[in-house]
């Protein structure tokens, strides 16, 4: 059936073709004979009859031949119609070219001269003016450069740089005086400090302004020398940990070949990196010391001192004062002895914050160095003496001997100005004369609180080699002493003697161990050790008026450095911390420590935290959950450590808790707020803040344990927590508290039976304790008698 249908269609198509051929032949015949046989008046009638004889398919083919062609698009986006002539096409292309050029010219003029994005209206106006050829392209640039907005902006940026006695200030009246007058600006504008990042020689600044004047205006050499004669040097000290470099004993000796080799290699590598920074002069390797990473591996920490140039009247950070020129090139020309040096970079003077940010970025981006952590110490930003040529590759001080990065206690801020570092090579000092200065033993408060590696120098006259300091002592960093306890440990603080610089380095490196041993041998506290026998009466008898706002204060401070934390003799290191679990709902049962919910949550946090703390913190001993508070769930806790730990306690605990927070969020779905982490060592913390005693309780110091505890005010007592007490529910003689739904733990008056039961339980506990003591004493007596009997029996035999 399908084949028959196709065959029928094919036959019909052939028939149409044959019929059309016949019609064409008839038309040709009639066209040849119409002028002879027929008069003109019958022409219209015959043509109409012939049109009707033509087939429908033929008319379709004829219409297809005369169909209009599609319009062609050029790659530029210009539409060219087939009906247009060549002249019209060229005019369209030129109009499109003029539009695009004007759009780009106006946009770049706003960006370069006015440093802003134009409004739609003013942008269209300038594009229309450009298309009408009212101004040529360069006239538009001159218009923008001579505008008052551009001149005000340029004056503002130039005045933000501090150049003493500038002679090239531009006045608006002079600039706008004559329409055809060329703007003249000194070439020193090219030397304006542009920003915190180093500028490459390919950059250009204000091309249109400086291009015509750089070759004509030259600043005299004497002027430049006077302008930049007073230069100061800025010193930045930092410590860099080398992850893949294990510490060796030879690095403790600055004269060993291995030390010299590693110091020279490190100095060359650092010079290549620091040369990219603006104003860099030189760098010194101060020394090396061992460092223990978080994963337990050992590495080497290197201390460096980098020296940069800076202007005497250092301005604020220039990062916010810049024009954003994007891809616009900035030319940098230097006028030196009357000649132009285009390949020289302009000098840029940065603040200490800018330098630290640039140094960190440069070291982190350097792939050839395996840099772990970068830590900046206090930099000495004062004016330094004008040194001669740099003859030493590194300072002769052994970094392993000196403890740096000392953590200061808030009670004793540094009030003395820091000492400047004096290069021993410039004063003719030998390597063995590098020693700390002698300290006057008058008062601890009058002495500088600590010394760092960069602030130690020899007390010598210039040109001499013998040192004056023979009895040298060094203060313990971070030691803060109240006035009442000064007499007890004044000898300790001034008795740690620094060995002479000419002695063996092994004796110097053992200074930290001697300090710890000396502290262990000497009891810094006059308070007796806690008794081993438990007592029922835990609270000190304090008058009522003394209970108001009583905050226990630690008698002695911890000795804290970057490498160790030491507690006073007879005590343990204690750290308070709190954290907030955001995705956990608070319940009123968490007010009461005897409730099942409190115990379950306490056990949960203990099981989570204790293994994590024990595996990550050396010397960890005990974790105590103090309480839970409302605010989602706030967990207040206390940790106890050994008497000394080999790290900075506060920083280490903070780092471990941050890691725990991340692990808990990923594995346990506990959302611990990072901003809620509050870590305070016991020597600086207010323990009452973490205890959160409540409205009807008072934070006092326990005489037996010497720790802060919550004590009820007169008429109140508690089995658990007193937070959320309501006034009026308790009175004198109150002994117990109960938890009410939605009200926390308000006190209530106990009845006689309850009070009797309470007294009975107390007596029962006392009897149990007495029985234990009696049974222990009896067992000891029996043991002694048995030994005496055996001895007599042996002698008798």
From Swiss-Prot:
Q: Does the keyword Signal feature in the UniProt annotation? A: yes
- Where does the UniProt entry place glycosylation sites? 42, 143, 191, 215, 403, 421, 432, 442, 592, 616, 630, 648
Task: Report the leader peptide range.
Answer: 1-20
Concerning PROSITE patterns, the annotation shows: SEA
Matching entries from SUPFAM superfamilies are given as:
SEA domain
Does the record's keyword annotation contain Endoplasmic reticulum? no
Tissue specificity is:
Expressed in the retina (at protein level). In the retina, specifically expressed by cone and rod photoreceptor cells. Localizes to cone and rod photoreceptor cells surrounding the interphotoreceptor matrix of the retina.
Q: Which Gene3D superfamilies match?
A: SEA domain (3.30.70.960)
What's one Pfam family the UniProt record gives for this protein?
Answer: SEA
Posttranslational modification: The N-terminus is blocked.
Locus of motif Heparin- and hyaluronan-binding? 621-629
Task: Using the record's annotation, list all stretches that form the SEA domain.
Answer: 232-354, 571-684
Q: Which domain of life is it from?
A: Eukaryota
Impact of altering residue 613 to P? Answer: In RP91; uncertain significance
Q: Which GO terms describe its molecular function?
A: chondroitin sulfate binding; extracellular matrix structural constituent; heparin binding; hyaluronic acid binding
Coiled-coil stretches are: none
Please state the pathology the record ties to this protein. Answer: Macular dystrophy, vitelliform, 4: A form of macular dystrophy, a retinal disease in which various forms of deposits, pigmentary changes, and atrophic lesions are observed in the macula lutea. Vitelliform macular dystrophies are characterized by yellow, lipofuscin-containing deposits, usually localized at the center of the macula. VMD4 features include late-onset moderate visual impairment, small satellite drusen-like lesions in the foveal area, and preservation of retinal pigment epithelium reflectivity.
- What's the protein name? Interphotoreceptor matrix proteoglycan 1
């Amino acid at each position: 059936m399908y084949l028959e249908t196709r065959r029928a269609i094919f036959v019909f198509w052939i028939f149409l073709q044959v019929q059309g051929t016949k019609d064409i032949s008839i038309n040709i015949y009639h066209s040849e004979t119409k002028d002879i046989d027929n008069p003109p008046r019958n022409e219209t009638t015959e043509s109409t009859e012939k049109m009707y004889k033509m087939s429908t398919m033929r008319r379709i083919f004829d219409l297809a031949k005369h169909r209009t062609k599609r319009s062609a698009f050029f790659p530029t986006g210009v539409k060219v119609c087939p009906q247009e002539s060549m002249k019209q096409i060229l005019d369209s292309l030129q109009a499109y070219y003029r539009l695009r050029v004007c759009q780009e010219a106006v946009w770049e003029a706003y960006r370069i001269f006015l440093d802003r994005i134009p409004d739609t209206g003013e942008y269209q106006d300038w594009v229309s003016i450009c298309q009408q050829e009212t101004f040529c392209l360069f006239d538009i640039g001159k218009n923008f450069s001579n505008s008052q907005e551009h001149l005000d902006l340029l004056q503002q940026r130039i005045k933000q740089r501090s150049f003493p006695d500038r002679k090239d200030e531009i006045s608006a009246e002079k600039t706008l005086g004559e329409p055809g007058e060329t703007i003249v600006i000194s070439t020193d504008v090219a030397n304006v400090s542009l920003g915190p990042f180093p500028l490459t020689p390919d950059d250009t600044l204000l091309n249109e302004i400086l291009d015509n004047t750089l070759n004509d205006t030259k600043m005299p050499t004497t002027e430049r020398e006077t302008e930049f004669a007073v230069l100061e040097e800025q010193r930045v000290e930092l410590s860099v940990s080398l992850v893949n470099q294990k510490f060796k004993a030879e690095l403790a000796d600055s004269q060993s070949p291995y030390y010299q080799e590693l110091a020279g290699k490190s100095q060359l590598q650092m010079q290549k990196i620091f040369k990219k920074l603006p104003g860099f002069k030189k760098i010194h390797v101060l020394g090396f010391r061992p460092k223990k990473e978080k994963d337990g591996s050992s590495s080497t920490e290197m201390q460096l001192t980098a020296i940069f140039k800076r202007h005497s009247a250092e301005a604020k950070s220039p990062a916010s004062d810049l024009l954003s020129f994007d891809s616009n090139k900035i030319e940098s020309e230097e006028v030196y002895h009357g000649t132009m040096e285009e390949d020289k970079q302009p000098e840029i003077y940065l603040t200490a914050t800018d330098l630290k940010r640039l140094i960190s970025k440069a070291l982190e981006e350097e792939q050839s160095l395996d840099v772990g952590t970068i830590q900046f110490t206090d930099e000495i930003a004062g004016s330094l003496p004008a040194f001669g040529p740099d003859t030493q590759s590194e300072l002769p001080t052994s970094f392993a001997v000196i403890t740096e990065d000392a953590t200061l206690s808030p009670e004793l801020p540094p009030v003395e100005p820091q000492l400047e570092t004096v290069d021993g090579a410039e004063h003719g000092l030998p390597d063995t004369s590098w020693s700390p200065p002698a300290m006057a033993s008058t008062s601890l408060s009058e002495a500088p609180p600590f010394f760092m590696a960069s602030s130690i120098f020899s007390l010598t006259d210039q040109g001499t080699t013998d040192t004056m300091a023979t009895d040298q002592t060094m203060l313990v960093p971070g030691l803060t002493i109240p006035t009442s306890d000064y007499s007890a440990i004044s000898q300790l603080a001034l008795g740690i003697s620094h060995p002479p610089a000419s002695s063996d380095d092994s004796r110097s490196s053992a200074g930290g161990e001697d300090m710890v041993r000396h502290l262990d041998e000497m009891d810094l506290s006059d308070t007796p050790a806690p008794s081993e026998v438990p007592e029922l009466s835990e609270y000190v008898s304090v008058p009522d008026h003394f209970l108001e706002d009583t905050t226990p204060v630690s008698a002695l401070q911890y000795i804290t450095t970057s490498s160790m934390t030491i507690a006073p003799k007879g005590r343990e290191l204690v750290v308070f911390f709190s954290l907030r679990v955001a995705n956990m709902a608070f319940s009123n049962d968490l007010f009461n420590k005897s409730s099942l919910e409190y115990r379950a949550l306490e056990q949960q946090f203990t099981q989570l935290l204790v293994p994590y703390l024990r595996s990550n913190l050396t010397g960890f001993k005990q974790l105590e959950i103090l309480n839970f508070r409302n605010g989602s769930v706030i967990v207040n806790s206390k940790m106890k450590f050994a008497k000394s730990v080999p790290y900075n306690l506060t920083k280490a605990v903070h780092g471990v808790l941050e890691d725990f927070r991340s692990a808990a969020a990923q594995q346990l779905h506990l959302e611990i707020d990072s901003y809620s982490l509050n870590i305070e060592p016991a020597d600086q913390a207010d323990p009452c803040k973490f205890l959160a005693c409540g409205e009807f309780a008072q934070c006092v110091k326990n005489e037996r344990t010497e720790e802060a505890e919550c004590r009820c005010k007169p008429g109140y007592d508690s089995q658990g927590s007193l937070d959320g007490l309501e006034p009026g529910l308790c009175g004198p003689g109150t002994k117990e508290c109960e938890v009410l739904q939605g009200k926390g733990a308000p006190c209530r008056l106990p009845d006689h039976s309850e009070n009797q039961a309470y007294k009975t339980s107390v007596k029962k506990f006392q009897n149990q304790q007495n029985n234990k003591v009696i049974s222990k004493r009896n067992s000891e007596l029996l043991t002694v008698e048995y030994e005496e009997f055996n001895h007599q029996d042996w002698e008798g035999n």
